[in-house]
Amino acid sequence: MTLKGALSVKFDVKCPADKFFSAFVEDTNRPFEKNGKTEIEAVDLVKKTMTIQMSGSEIQKYFKTLKGSIAVTPIGVGDGSHVVWTFHFEKVHKDIDDPHSIIDESVKYFKKLDEAILNFKE
């Protein structure tokens, strides 16, 4: 296995891109923050992209660097959004597995966020 890599997942959500992206940017309870801390590196509200750097003692046992990037684009008027979530990583050593479990947990989180937005009554 290589030390550096990237994993990416593409999926659709039912929410409009603006609402979904705003909810993600404003959320302070992202699941990948449980084992460390996150620092926002870049946010583009027009393009609906964001990159975060993850760190902390638990993460640093396995990864020298771990960054997540999201891009949200509208499918069409009232048709939901496409989401691309990518992790760029550098492992501490080659025997560490790629962070597939973090990707899987992230998708579950995004689906729950989508449902919460859809069920929210203003």
Curated annotation (Swiss-Prot):
Pfam families in the record: Bet_v_1
Superkingdom of origin organism: Eukaryota
GO biological process: defense response
Signal peptide (from-to): none
Alphabetical list of InterPro entries matching this protein: Bet_v_I/MLP, MLP-like_ligand-binding, START-like_dom_sf
This protein's name: Uncharacterized protein At1g24000
Organism: Arabidopsis thaliana
Upper classification of the organism: Eukaryota, Viridiplantae, Streptophyta, Embryophyta, Tracheophyta
